[in-house]
Structure formats: structure tokens, C-alpha cells
């Protein structure tokens, strides 16, 4: 893994910082695990914008990732590591002993040729997936399930991990990167180690066009708009003279947005600001 600063051969290259990984596969992805991915432009089925700042971008195929890791007792060999345009983490193509291939999130330190396994009998090593009741307290894990059998939902982006800090009967207590402490059923699965490609956060796109390649459109300040477009719009000068709000008039600085009281009992400590 190398961090490369580009030479300033043009204004668009002057500030570019790339993360180069020579171990990534340079050919095409494994076709049976690809799906077509159509662009939504941030619109829902009514054609209305539900997510702003989305549109355009390069065509992509979706890679079918095995977040469940439920192929127990069958060892698999890592064939290669690959780039995935749909996520910040890299992925690994693994070949199981029965001939099936699957994509998984590539943990830190995983290399082609290594062997991994899932299930209660799996060894305690990076890349193996097993129920958290079988993982030692203090271990760092990723791709953590929130409901048994649903598939990993926590700690899936580049460099992410969760630490198991306690085990109490049917639940384990996890410390998330945000500082939140949360209880989850000990039957839920997790993959040992942390997600690889942690250097992803060091990259610098260098120009607006690089964001457009990724399907990200510009973010315009409300105070730069007209009154018809935003509550902050209009007026002379830059002051909008009111508490900051969203385009729909909802307070935006420090307002609580969590409404899922049903799962509050599982949160031992709130995330630190």
C-alpha cells in the first residue's frame, strides 16, 4: 500500500493524492457475482428527490458481497483482492473447497493464498467469521450482525472495526468507533480483524470532476440561494438572521434526530461528540 502525491502537471493534478495497492487484481471482476446497477439520480419511485447531491457518475456493476458468512465448516482460499467501486473497502474473491466462489470484505492483512473459514469451529484469526459468543473478549471485529442471520451491518467501511468489551449471558457489549457502547445478541456473527484499506481516508480527489465521476453533485449553500429555494435564501449581504434550518425548515444544528425508542434499551452509552 503506497500513498502517491501526483506531480502538478495540470491544475487538476496539483493536489491529487492517490492510494496505490499493487496487490489488487488488475483484470475484470468475477462475472457470476456481478449485477447491473441502474442510476437513480437520488429519486424515488415517484420521481421525487429523496437524497440530494446525487447524479451522473461512471457506470458500475454491483458486486454481490457475502455479508452473512454462513458457509460453515468448509475452508476457503483467497484467490485475489479486488477494487470495489461501490464501497471504500477492498473485497476478496474466495474459493471454497466445494467449488463455490464468493466475495467478502477484505480484512487488514489478508493476502491471496491464505485460508479462511466460517462457523463455531473456526480459528481465532483475521478473516474468519463466527458467532460472538465464541470470540474472546477484547477482540476487534468487523462486519457485525445486529440480528442473527441477517448479515453484517456494523463496521463495513475501510478501516472500520468494533471491539468486544464484555459478555453477559445472551448479549455481548460492543464499543463502536463513535464511542457508543451497545448490546447485541451473542449469537450474531462477526468477522475477526478490522476492515482493510484504512489509508482510504488519506486520498485527495484534487478537483470537482473527480467527485462527479463518483456520482456526487455540488452542495450549494442555502444562503447563496433565492428565498423560493431555501429558508436562508435572499436578502442583502450574507446574513440570513435566523436559526440555521434545513431546506424544509427543520432545525439543523444539534437537533436530536433519533426516534427509534424501541432499541434504546440496547444502547449502554451514547456516542461521544
Swiss-Prot record:
**Record-linked InterPro entries:** NA-bd_OB-fold (IPR012340), Rib_uL2_dom2 (IPR014722), Ribosomal_uL2 (IPR002171), Ribosomal_uL2_bac/org-type (IPR005880), Ribosomal_uL2_C (IPR022669), Ribosomal_uL2_CS (IPR022671), Ribosomal_uL2_dom3 (IPR014726), Ribosomal_uL2_RNA-bd_dom (IPR022666)
Q: Name one GO cellular component term.
A: large ribosomal subunit
Q: What's in the keyword line of the UniProt record?
A: Ribonucleoprotein, Ribosomal protein, RNA-binding, rRNA-binding
The protein's assembly and partners: Part of the 50S ribosomal subunit. Forms a bridge to the 30S subunit in the 70S ribosome.
GO MF entries: rRNA binding; structural constituent of ribosome; transferase activity
Q: Where is this region: Disordered?
A: 221-273
Instruction: Kindly indicate whether the keyword Ribosomal protein belongs to this entry.
Output: yes
The entry sums up its family as follows: Belongs to the universal ribosomal protein uL2 family.
What is the name listed in the Swiss-Prot or TrEMBL entry for this protein? Large ribosomal subunit protein uL2
Superkingdom of origin: Bacteria
| A Gene Ontology biological process term | cytoplasmic translation
Q: Which SMART domains match?
A: Ribosomal_L2 (SM01383), Ribosomal_L2_C (SM01382)
| Biological role stated in the UniProt entry | One of the primary rRNA binding proteins. Required for association of the 30S and 50S subunits to form the 70S ribosome, for tRNA binding and peptide bond formation. It has been suggested to have peptidyltransferase activity; this is somewhat controversial. Makes several contacts with the 16S rRNA in the 70S ribosome.
Check the record and name the Gene3D superfamilies matching this protein: 2.30.30.30, Nucleic acid-binding proteins, Ribosomal protein L2, domain 3
